[in-house]
């Protein structure tokens, strides 16, 4: 058998195998994995036996790719097995564990991750917990004995938007839950030293030195990777200006720390040339660079992104440390394979793709022999090229790209990297002495002022928020190939033709609707409600999902991506049925992200610039009729009972959205507008509360389907069993977003189509599966 000689193609083959797992709805069975492993072994033996050749080289690549697939699938199966046993969901469980990472504190709760050390039953090694209404302030490394109520990681599933279940799997979170009560500590549960305790102390010192605000939050992110104070509005600002990569500690900052470490040792050798006789300078500088990067990465919390950066730096320095000449692509694939061997599920995170994608582009553009170029070209072209190169990745993960990013980063990258970050590193060195570090923190804050003004200006530019649908796999691959062609070296034939491969990115995933048709979507927003209605040329949103006490909401995380996914850049009309946080929580962030033609609300003055939602209003869009059935102008605002009730009727059917009205208003609607209530689809009132969706109302509406918008295992037990029984007696099919994810239904001229459930249509192997309750 021939000796194995490393080639960059081997690394790409292994990466391709691990990434092949991502689009699968189910993991391969154990038997299938065994067969694939055997095939890979046979292929490897055949490839590296006898004389070499192109066919055997290709066979070797196939074997390596299969090994990558089998390895990633085995780790994925193990991660899934480490999730909470379903039988323990909703039960009180006693456990002990260490606080891991930086706790997030707000007025109502403390949220943190816990590494378990003991428990009455077999439990996940890592879980995410909330502690409500507590005066306790746990610190990193504290060991706590607790009684907790847990559930398996379960997020919202829509056609686009944030995927918590993917994030939980990538972070090895096996359960989420809340703390019922704390128990007295025991001797086997002792606090441990944790670097996060140091980070928390530094964050406290920054709090004392600087006033609250975005600049202080940015300094924490840059200095110690602490993004707890950065709210959704700030993240939106950073995304719109294309500067997200600068805010939390990134590969760029760790790389700068490595460069400073190597540079300081170079200075030492310059001052004492005789050191080179004992230890060669290149190797010493490489070791110093790596050690400095390690220290900085640890201060940043040693998160997965910083771990990837350290591995990449080590791979890039491998040639120096081993005194071997290694090409850029060899070093790149060494880093790629090392990262994937350490964590084959790293491709679940956007950071993996963005960091390796950016480095690949830089090698493609500048890895060949360097040629002198004008300064403007040497600085501007990489920024423009990087924006184009990362466009498919940005759309795949965020459905958004900032066309202002190249301009902003031309100024922001050198300003932050070479001015702000070195000052922050100095402040970190001086942090044990508050009287010395405080002025340095304040200096950095003052210098961040121009950067903050720049991103605010950039975020207001017309093309700063360019949203597009999340690309299909085919469109994504075509775009990557097109970009490789477009950014090929000078002299490559027909480089401009690569732009045509980007055109599929512009295509909406949802088909155009004919006159008289409409699409009804009940988005998965947890314990809240948001209903999207789309006609041939118009879009209506009824309610904006829940907001949270810490200031976050689902406008950014769910609604904006869902609208971008169907190619909607703005809303023609927004109706906020009433002022409760679970229906109106996402309004502010949605107004910040999208243009909205008109806003209606039932609560006077609740939304600036909104019109009052009033009974009797009718309008027609593209052959589809809309009508407000409640509230009348004579009714004072009564909270739930003043909810806007919206009826939609098209050529293929009709739907009713009653908000949170109860049986009293239902009875009034039956008496006064009974002839308008007969519809095909009813969104259950008040999420399935026992005080709504009465038997009389169901008899008047006669729905074929009833949809519930509710949170998974919600504390209200919505939909209540009595409501489910009423709907069953009425003969309607029942669908619940808590079980099925977002629900989509087309009303076409030929009739009402079969509903589509996101937890089935968008299923990936890390998603929890659920059977439709009450569905045929």
Residue ranges and their predicted role:
Residues 9, 177, 231-406, 468-515, ...:
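Hydrophobic alpha-helical transmembrane segments in multi-pass membrane proteins
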Residues 2-8, 12, 144-146, 167-310, ...:
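Aromatic-rich juxtamembrane segments at the membrane interface
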Residues 666-742:
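Cap/insert and terminal regions of metallo-dependent hydrolase folds
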Residues 1-84, 88-95, 184, 265-280, ...:
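Transmembrane helix-bundle segments that form internal channels/tunnels in multi-pass membrane proteins
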Residues 227, 318, 340-347, 456-573, ...:
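Core dinuclear metal-dependent hydrolase active-site scaffold
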Residues 2-4, 57, 62-245, 552, ...:
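Membrane-interface helix/helix-cap signal primarily in integral membrane proteins
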Residues 17, 97, 148, 222, ...:
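Divalent metal-coordination and catalytic microenvironments
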Residues 243-264, 569-593, 682-696:
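Di-metal (Zn2+ and/or Mg2+/Mn2+) metal-binding site signature of metallo-dependent hydrolases
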């Amino acid at each position: 058998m021939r000796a194995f000689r490393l080639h960059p193609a081997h690394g790409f083959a292994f990466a391709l195998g691990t990434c092949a797992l991502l689009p699968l709805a189910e993991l391969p069975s154990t038997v299938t994995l065994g067969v694939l492993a055997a095939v890979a072994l046979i292929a490897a033996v055949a490839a590296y036996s006898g004389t070499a050749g192109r066919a055997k080289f290709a066979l070797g690549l196939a074997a390596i790719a299969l090994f990558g697939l089998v390895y990633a699938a085995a780790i994925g199966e193990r991660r899934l097995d480490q999730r909470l046993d379903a039988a323990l969901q909703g039960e009180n469980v006693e456990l002990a564990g260490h606080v891991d990472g930086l706790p997030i504190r707000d007025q109502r709760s403390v949220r943190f991750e816990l590494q378990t050390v003991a428990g009455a039953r077999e439990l996940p090694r890592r879980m995410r917990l909330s502690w409500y209404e507590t005066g306790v302030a746990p610190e990193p490394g504290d060991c706590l004995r607790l009684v907790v109520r847990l559930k398996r990681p379960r997020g919202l599933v829509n056609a686009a938007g944030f995927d918590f279940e993917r994030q939980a799997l990538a972070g090895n979170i096996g359960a989420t839950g809340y703390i019922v009560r704390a128990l007295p500590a025991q001797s086997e549960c002792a606090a441990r030293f944790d670097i996060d305790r140091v980070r928390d102390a530094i964050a406290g010192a920054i709090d004392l030195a600087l006033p609250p605000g975005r600049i202080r939050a940015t300094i924490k992110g840059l200095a110690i990777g602490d993004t707890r104070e950065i709210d959704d509005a700030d993240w939106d600002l950073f995304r719109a200006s294309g500067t997200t990569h600068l805010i939390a500690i990134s590969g760029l900052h760790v790389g700068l720390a490595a460069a400073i470490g190597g540079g300081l040792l170079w200075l030492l050798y310059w001052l004492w040339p005789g050191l080179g006789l004992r230890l060669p300078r290149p190797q010493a500088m490489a070791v110093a660079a790596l050690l400095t990067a390690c220290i900085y990465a640890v201060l940043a919390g040693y998160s997965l992104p910083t771990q990837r950066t350290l591995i990449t730096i080590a791979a890039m320095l491998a040639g120096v440390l081993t005194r071997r000449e290694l090409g850029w692509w060899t070093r790149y694939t060494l880093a790629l394979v090392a990262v994937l061997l350490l964590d084959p599920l790293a491709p679940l995170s956007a950071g993996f793709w963005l960091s390796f994608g950016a480095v690949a582009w830089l090698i493609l553009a500048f890895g060949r022999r360097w040629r002198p170029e004008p300064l403007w070209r040497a600085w501007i072209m990489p920024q423009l090229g990087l924006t184009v190169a990362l466009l498919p990745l940005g759309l795949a993960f965020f459905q958004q790209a900032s066309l202002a990013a190249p301009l902003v980063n031309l100024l922001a990258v050198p300003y932050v990297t070479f001015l702000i970050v070195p000052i922050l590193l100095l402040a970190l060195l001086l942090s044990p002495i508050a009287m010395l570090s405080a002025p340095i923190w304040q200096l950095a804050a003052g210098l961040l002022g121009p950067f903050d003004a720049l991103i605010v200006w950039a975020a207001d530019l017309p093309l700063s928020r360019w949203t597009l649908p999340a690309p299909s796999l085919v469109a994504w691959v075509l775009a990557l190939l097109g970009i490789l062609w477009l950014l090929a070296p000078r002299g490559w034939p027909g480089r401009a033709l690569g732009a045509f491969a980007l055109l599929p990115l512009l295509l909406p995933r949802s088909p155009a609707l004919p006159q008289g048709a409409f699409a009804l979507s009940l988005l998965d927003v947890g314990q809240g409600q948001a209903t999207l209605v789309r006609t041939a040329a118009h879009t209506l949103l009824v309610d904006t999902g829940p907001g949270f006490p810490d200031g976050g909401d689902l406008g950014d995380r769910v609604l904006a991506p869902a609208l971008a996914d169907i190619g909607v850049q703005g809303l023609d009309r927004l109706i906020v049925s009433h002022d409760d946080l679970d229906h109106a929580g996402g309004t502010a962030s949605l107004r910040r992200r999208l243009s909205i033609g008109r806003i209606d609300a039932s609560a006077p003055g609740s939304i600036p610039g909104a019109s009052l939602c009033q009974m009797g209003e009718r309008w027609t869009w593209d052959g589809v009729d809309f009508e407000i059935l409640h509230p009348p102008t004579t009714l004072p605002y009564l909270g739930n009972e003043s909810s806007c009730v919206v009826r939609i009727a098209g050529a293929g059917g009709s739907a009713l959205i009653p908000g949170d009205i109860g049986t009293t208003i239902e009875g009034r609607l039956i008496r006064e507008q009974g002839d308008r209530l007969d519809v095909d689809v009813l969104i259950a009132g008040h999420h399935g509360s026992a005080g709504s969706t009465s038997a009389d109302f169901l008899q008047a509406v006669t729905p074929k389907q009833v949809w519930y918008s509710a949170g998974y295992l919600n504390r209200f037990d919505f939909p209540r069993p009595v409501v489910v029984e009423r709907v069953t007696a009425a003969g309607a099919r029942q669908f619940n977003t808590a079980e099925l994810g977002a629900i989509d239904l087309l009303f076409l001229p030929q009739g009402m189509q079969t509903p589509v459930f996101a937890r089935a249509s968008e299923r990936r192997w890390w998603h929890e599966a659920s059977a439709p309750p009450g569905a045929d």
